[in-house]
């Protein structure tokens, strides 16, 4: 059975890589010059490729650290030595973009290993389900598209997933080192390094919580009634747990590599004067709470075969009626957050090359009341996401939610790329769906990818004040 699964995996990876190479060829023919953010990334990588590493050579418009450029040089330079290629060839636009295609292969393998580690291997979860889940996430439209451009997404996801995998296997020093590599690609990846530390803490809290519940059961104490009572009991437990010096010392011994990484991050923020390097004018942090609602909607859209069904809607409505007071409070809080904390970034309104421009224009700008009318949909999407993670412990869910808030809420710009990592982490930890739903999901992703690539490559346009060819993209 294991050998058969290996054949399935090899076939899926080979087919995906073949299709990716064909798409890469189409991209290379259509895009012979840097496009969008590549106008900053590619020249910087080429300067590094030429050995010009001084700070005076740094483009101040770049807001991320040089992880992508350093790894690219580490990949393409040995190729020039081994194959005898000229510097002009190995530092070309095509070769640098190809680095991300290599990252996509690594991401495919890491996703497969993570599914094998996270999902219990029993008769209920077949090898076909794991392979299909891996294939589906590997071609997840928002991530897959950026495998063909010189952006930080593919490498950022690679090192973050690698760090998560090492954490699950207990190699925490390696995990923290890989987390640092992820941070070098995108500063906000420090949150997912903290997520790895949180995973350990959640695991230990779950073990202690089970012991506590068993003790209460033996003492025949009444169980908690209702979610608020349960939450209060969990918070009391966490308070008591954190007051124990023995528990704190044990957690520190397990998480010290991550603590060192977080300390280094705080030193960086103090010395740098903020999390962003380079141009900070367009990357202002704020409390943009509706970003959570956008993420839940994004997740419901891309996971609709698993989250949307008449049964789920009926269950949700029944729960709303049963706990109408609690849901009324949640609704009022949500409306208040939408009212007071909705921000519209200047890029969202100015750049008509991104799909988010059209989502905002054709949905949110139709009428001022639309953003409030969407609150019930946000609530259903949030409940559906939480319900699909009920197999995880309450401590894991709390830790994931904290990291989700930290990675989305401070972002002023509505940008689907910011949702890639939290979505992948969510999808990895959701129980393996039935094969029929996975096939449906994969088919939908294939259609979305086809449309995205077709529109990007064929439906070009020009601005009135520029002769440059513009393209639609995520």
Curated annotation (Swiss-Prot):
Interacts with KCNH1; may regulate KCNH1, possibly by regulating its N-glycosylation. Interacts with KCNH2; may reduce KCNH2 sensitivity to classic proarrhythmic drug blockade, possibly by regulating its N-glycosylation. The lineage of its organism: Eukaryota, Metazoa, Chordata, Craniata, Vertebrata. It catalyses: an alpha-D-Glc-(1->3)-alpha-D-Glc-(1->3)-alpha-D-Man-(1->2)-alpha-D-Man-(1->2)-alpha-D-Man-(1->3)-[alpha-D-Man-(1->2)-alpha-D-Man-(1->3)-[alpha-D-Man-(1->2)-alpha-D-Man-(1->6)]-alpha-D-Man-(1->6)]-beta-D-Man-(1->4)-beta-D-GlcNAc-(1->4)-alpha-D-GlcNAc-diphospho-di-trans,poly-cis-dolichol + a di-trans,poly-cis-dolichyl beta-D-glucosyl phosphate = a alpha-D-Glc-(1->2)-alpha-D-Glc-(1->3)-alpha-D-Glc-(1->3)-alpha-D-Man-(1->2)-alpha-D-Man-(1->2)-alpha-D-Man-(1->3)-[alpha-D-Man-(1->2)-alpha-D-Man-(1->3)-[alpha-D-Man-(1->2)-alpha-D-Man-(1->6)]-alpha-D-Man-(1->6)]-beta-D-Man-(1->4)-beta-D-GlcNAc-(1->4)-alpha-D-GlcNAc-diphospho-di-trans,poly-cis-dolichol + a di-trans,poly-cis-dolichyl phosphate + H(+). It comes from Rattus norvegicus. Residues 28-64, 119-126, 172-175, 278-283, 339-365, 414-436 are extracellular. Its EC number is 2.4.1.256. It holds the Pfam family DIE2_ALG10. Belongs to the ALG10 glucosyltransferase family. Pathway: Protein modification; protein glycosylation. Highly expressed in brain, skeletal muscle, uterus, small intestine and liver. Moderately expressed in lung and kidney. Weakly expressed in heart and stomach. Residues 1-6, 86-97, 148-150, 197-256, 305-317, 387-392, 458-473 are cytoplasmic. This is Dol-P-Glc:Glc(2)Man(9)GlcNAc(2)-PP-Dol alpha-1,2-glucosyltransferase. InterPro entries: Alg10 (IPR016900). GO terms for cellular component: endoplasmic reticulum; endoplasmic reticulum membrane. Dol-P-Glc:Glc(2)Man(9)GlcNAc(2)-PP-Dol alpha-1,2-glucosyltransferase that operates in the biosynthetic pathway of dolichol-linked oligosaccharides, the glycan precursors employed in protein asparagine (N)-glycosylation. The assembly of dolichol-linked oligosaccharides begins on the cytosolic side of the endoplasmic reticulum membrane and finishes in its lumen. The sequential addition of sugars to dolichol pyrophosphate produces dolichol-linked oligosaccharides containing fourteen sugars, including two GlcNAcs, nine mannoses and three glucoses.
């Amino acid at each position: 059975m294991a050998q058969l699964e290996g054949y399935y995996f090899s076939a899926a990876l080979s087919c995906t890589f073949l299709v990716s190479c064909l798409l890469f060829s189409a991209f290379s023919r259509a895009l012979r010059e840097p496009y969008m953010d590549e106008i900053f990334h590619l020249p910087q990588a080429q300067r590094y490729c030429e050995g010009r590493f001084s700070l005076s050579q740094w483009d101040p418009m770049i807001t991320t650290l040089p992880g992508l450029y350093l790894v690219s040089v580490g990949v393409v330079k040995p190729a020039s030595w081994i194959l005898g290629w000229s510097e002009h060839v190995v530092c070309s636009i095509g070769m640098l973009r190809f680095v991300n295609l290599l990252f996509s292969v690594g991401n495919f393998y890491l996703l497969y290993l993570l599914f094998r580690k996270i999902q219990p291997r029993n008769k209920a979860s077949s090898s076909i389900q794991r392979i299909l889940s891996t294939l589906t996430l590997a071609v997840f439209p928002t991530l897959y598209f950026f495998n063909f451009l010189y952006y930080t997404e593919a490498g950022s996801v690679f090192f973050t997933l690698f760090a998560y995998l090492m954490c699950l296997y207990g190699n925490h020093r390696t995990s923290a080192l890989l987390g640092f590599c992820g941070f070098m690609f995108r500063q906000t990846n420090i949150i997912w390094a903290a997520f790895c530390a949180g995973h350990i803490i959640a695991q230990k809290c779950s073990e202690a919580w089970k012991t506590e519940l068993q003790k209460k059961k033996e003492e025949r104490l009444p169980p908690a009634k209702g979610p608020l009572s349960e939450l209060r009991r969990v918070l009391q437990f966490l308070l008591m747990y954190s007051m124990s010096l023995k528990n704190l010392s044990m957690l520190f011994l397990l998480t010290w590599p991550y603590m060192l990484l977080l300390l280094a991050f705080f030193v960086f923020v103090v010395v740098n004067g903020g999390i962003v390097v380079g141009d900070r004018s367009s990357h202002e942090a704020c409390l943009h709470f509706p970003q959570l609602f956008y993420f839940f909607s994004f997740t419901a859209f891309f996971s609709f075969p698993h989250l949307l069904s008449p049964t789920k809607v009926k269950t949700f409505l029944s729960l709303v009626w049963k706990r109408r007071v609690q849901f009324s409070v949640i609704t009022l809080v949500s409306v208040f957050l939408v009212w007071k904390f909705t921000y519209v970034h200047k890029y969202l309104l100015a750049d008509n090359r991104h799909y988010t421009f059209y989502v905002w224009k054709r949905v949110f700008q139709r009428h001022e009341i639309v953003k409030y009318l969407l609150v019930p949909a946000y609530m259903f999407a949030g409940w559906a996401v939480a319900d699909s993670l009920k197999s995880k412990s309450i401590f894991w869910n709390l830790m994931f939610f904290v990291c989700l808030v930290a990675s989305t809420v401070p972002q002023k710009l509505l940008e689907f790329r910011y949702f890639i990592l939290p979505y992948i982490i969510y999808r990895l930890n959701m129980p393996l769906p039935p094969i029929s739903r996975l096939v449906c999901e994969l088919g939908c992703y294939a259609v979305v990818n086809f449309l995205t690539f077709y529109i990007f490559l064929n439906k070009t346009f020009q601005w009135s004040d520029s002769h440059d060819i513009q393209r639609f993209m995520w």
